[in-house]
């Protein structure tokens, strides 16, 4: 059985926060899709609270579509230390870093949580705008690196 790409990453050596280009996949018709690791918190040291992470997911899923072209999906990591971002095309990590930082600035300006109703969300009661803003501010203050080892 082939090991999942993210399981090959030595989580004890990385230094969050960072933006990591994980892979570029080639479709059968020549299209490309790029997967990114948007790591906000240090693995095995910190983790998001669920309401804050869920809120940040809603906000970033909305704002990243304004700041980056070709967004397919933003998904929370099960370990609750960051998100996976999937984009059409072969996209540069620096472009994603800039778009992510712009989206996080929009999070700080937000006064309403998008898709916060039972119709729009499967767990709408577990959303925290306050918590999402706290994490956004913290990660912007620290700054995202393009070097996963923090050098």
From Swiss-Prot:
EC number(s) given by UniProt: 4.4.1.21
Database matches in Gene3D superfamilies: S-ribosylhomocysteinase (LuxS)
Pfam families documented for this protein: LuxS
Enzyme class: lyase
Record keywords, A-Z: Autoinducer synthesis, Iron, Lyase, Metal-binding, Quorum sensing
Keyword Iron applies: yes
Record note on cofactor: Binds 1 Fe cation per subunit.
MF (Gene Ontology): iron ion binding; S-ribosylhomocysteine lyase activity
Listed NCBIfam families: PRK02260.2-4 (NF002606)
Family annotation (HAMAP family): LuxS
Protein purpose: Involved in the synthesis of autoinducer 2 (AI-2) which is secreted by bacteria and is used to communicate both the cell density and the metabolic potential of the environment. The regulation of gene expression in response to changes in cell density is called quorum sensing. Catalyzes the transformation of S-ribosylhomocysteine (RHC) to homocysteine (HC) and 4,5-dihydroxy-2,3-pentadione (DPD).
Protein's name in the database: S-ribosylhomocysteine lyase
Taxonomic source organism: Clostridioides difficile (strain 630)
């Amino acid at each position: 059985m082939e090991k999942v790409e993210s399981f090959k990453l030595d989580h004890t050596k990385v230094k969050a926060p960072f933006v990591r280009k994980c892979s570029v996949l080639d479709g059968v018709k020549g299209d490309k899709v790029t997967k990114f690791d948007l790591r906000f918190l240090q693995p095995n040291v910190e983790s998001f609270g669920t309401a804050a992470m869920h809120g940040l997911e809603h906000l970033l899923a909305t704002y990243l579509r304004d700041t980056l072209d070709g967004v397919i999906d933003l998904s929370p990591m099960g370990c609750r230390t960051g998100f996976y971002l999937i984009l059409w095309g072969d996209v540069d990590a620096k472009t994603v870093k800039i778009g992510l930082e712009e989206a996080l600035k929009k999070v700080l300006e937000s006064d309403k949580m998008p898709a916060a109703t039972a119709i729009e969300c499967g767990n709408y009661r577990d959303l925290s705008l306050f918590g999402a803003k706290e994490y956004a501010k913290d990660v912007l203050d620290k700054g995202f690196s393009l070097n996963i080892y923090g050098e």
